[in-house]
């Protein structure tokens, strides 16, 4: 019966004219008489519209860096409003994505037993509450870290608390762990997973990562409430997010929560991280939100760049003793380097952590020192601070970073920066005839 349908249809097409065929079969025929010039106009219009749609939705478009991002900064004098607007665009699918995102094999790296197609991550602080995970990952990142998330909701410090230093490609923030709290963020992550499981994408059951992408990872950065307990708040974080994170990050280095950086002292940090690892291990058989029967997310600790060598050595010892899986170097700095171009002393002297290009020398120095004291330990080092190019990424890798993270440069340059960094990194690696994995720690071997 099915094989006869095309034969009958073709016979009708040959024995009836077009109008008779459409009327006889209850369809409305297309209006005849579209002139050549009109048809050309329609065709050109559709072509231009399609090209414009592709161009503006593609993160590689220069429009985003040179037009859209400057416009957003212009209409949001308070940098925090710009931050919120950016997250709104990313959350609602209005931000451009990286079309044809096929990472070159030289960028592939295995971290914590899992493959990433590229080692470029989005640092914590951009998406504090996990609202825009898909919008960010679709821009080409290989990893995203949301948070910091605190056990209870808290507003953070009073506004204004986020300041741009555009001449330096830098920002100062004193957000103070503003967070929706564990329950809200867990609900957001669970809703995302539920939608994914109910969609066609999960039918082949091939996605194991909680990022919901085959070769990308999701990290959750854990913080403490302003008046919270310095140990229990982190243990609550592990309990809340063990099922939802590919990676757990213990943030003991934000300069905007009173007393937090004191947790970096060796004895205190060793005790904290030992308890965190024990809590993680006790929950392994609870599985994860995708249905895995066991789940053991690696634990990383994020530290400050404002440390002398002896302090870095003691943190390395704490990390080894507690058996965490890695260290992120680094958070923002409370220093104001003399290299700053910004002359507005009121702006430069704002309290808070400085991030962006001026942070790079401090973060890189701290990374090299940390690599020196963790060599041979198996600890994974993640570089973060002032990265804005492929050359920067290469420099951090050679200093010991298996992966790098960025945020401030992304905010200034727009979503196209990720493709640019990956392209530049690929080109530089091929010039050396090496892969990313081969250059990790090259300068400290």
UniProtKB/Swiss-Prot annotation:
Signal peptide: none annotated. One of its GO terms (cellular component) is mitochondrial inner membrane. Its EC number is 1.3.5.2. The chain crosses the membrane at residues 39-56. Its main location: mitochondrion. Substrate binds at residues 128, 173-177, 251-256, 331-332. It is a single-pass membrane protein. Binds 1 FMN per subunit. GO terms for molecular function: dihydroorotate dehydrogenase (quinone) activity. It is found in: Mitochondrion inner membrane. Its cofactor is FMN. The active site is at 254 (nucleophile). One of its GO terms (biological process) is 'de novo' UMP biosynthetic process. Pathway: Pyrimidine metabolism; UMP biosynthesis via de novo pathway; orotate from (S)-dihydroorotate (quinone route): step 1/1. Gene3D superfamilies: Aldolase class I (3.20.20.70). InterPro entries: Aldolase_TIM (IPR013785), DHO_dehydrogenase (IPR050074), Dihydroorotate_DH_2 (IPR005719), Dihydroorotate_DH_cat (IPR005720), Dihydroorotate_DH_CS (IPR001295). It catalyses: (S)-dihydroorotate + a quinone = orotate + a quinol. Residues 1-16 form a transit peptide. K.lactis has two isoforms of DHODase, a cytoplasmic isoform and a mitochondrial isoform. Belongs to the dihydroorotate dehydrogenase family. Type 2 subfamily. This is Dihydroorotate dehydrogenase (quinone), mitochondrial. The gene is URA9.
């Amino acid at each position: 019966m099915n094989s006869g349908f095309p034969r009958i249809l073709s016979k009708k097409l040959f024995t009836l004219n077009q109008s008779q065929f459409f009327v006889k079969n209850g369809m409305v025929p297309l209006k005849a008489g579209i002139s050549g010039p009109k048809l050309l106009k329609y065709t050109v219009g559709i072509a231009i519209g399609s090209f414009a749609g592709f161009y503006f939705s593609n993160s590689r478009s220069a429009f985003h860096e040179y037009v859209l991002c400057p416009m957003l900064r212009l209409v949001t004098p308070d940098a925090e409003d710009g931050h919120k607007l950016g997250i709104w665009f990313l959350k609602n699918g209005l931000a451009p994505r990286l079309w044809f995102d096929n990472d070159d094999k030289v960028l592939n790296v295995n971290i914590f037993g899992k493959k990433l197609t590229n080692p470029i991550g989005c640092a914590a602080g951009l998406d504090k509450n996990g609202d825009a995970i898909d919008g960010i990952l679709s821009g080409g990142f290989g990893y995203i870290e949301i948070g910091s998330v605190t056990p209870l909701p808290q507003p953070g410090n009073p506004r204004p608390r986020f300041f741009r230093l555009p001449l330096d490609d830098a920002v100062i923030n004193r957000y103070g762990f503003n967070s929706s709290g564990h329950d809200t963020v867990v609900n957001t992550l669970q809703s995302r997973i539920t939608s994914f499981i109910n969609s066609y994408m999960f039918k082949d059951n091939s996605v194991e990562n909680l990022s919901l992408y085959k070769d990308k990872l999701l990290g959750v950065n854990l913080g403490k409430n302003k008046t919270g307990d310095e140990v229990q708040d982190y243990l609550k974080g592990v309990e809340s997010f063990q099922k939802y994170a590919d990676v757990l990050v213990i943030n003991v280095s934000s300069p905007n929560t009173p007393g937090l950086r004191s947790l970096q002292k060796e004895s205190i940090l060793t005790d904290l991280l030992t308890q965190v690892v024990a809590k993680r291990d006790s929950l392994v058989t609870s599985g994860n939100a995708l249905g895995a029967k066991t789940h053991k997310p690696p634990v990383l600790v994020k530290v400050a760049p404002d440390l002398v060598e002896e302090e870095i050595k003691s943190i390395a010892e704490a990390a080894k003793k507690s058996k965490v899986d890695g260290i992120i170097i680094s958070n923002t700095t409370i220093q104001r380097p003399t290299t700053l171009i910004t002359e507005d002393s009121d702006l430069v002297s704002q309290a808070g952590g400085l991030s962006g290009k001026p942070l790079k020398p401090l973060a890189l120095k701290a990374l090299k020192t940390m690599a020196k004291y963790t060599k041979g330990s198996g600890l994974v080092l993640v570089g973060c601070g002032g990265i804005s190019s492929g050359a920067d990424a290469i420099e951090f890798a050679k200093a010991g970073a298996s992966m790098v993270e960025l945020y401030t440069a992304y905010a200034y340059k727009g979503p196209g920066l990720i493709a640019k960094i990956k392209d530049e990194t690929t080109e530089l690696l091929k010039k050396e005839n090496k892969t990313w994995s081969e250059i990790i720690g090259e300068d400290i071997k």
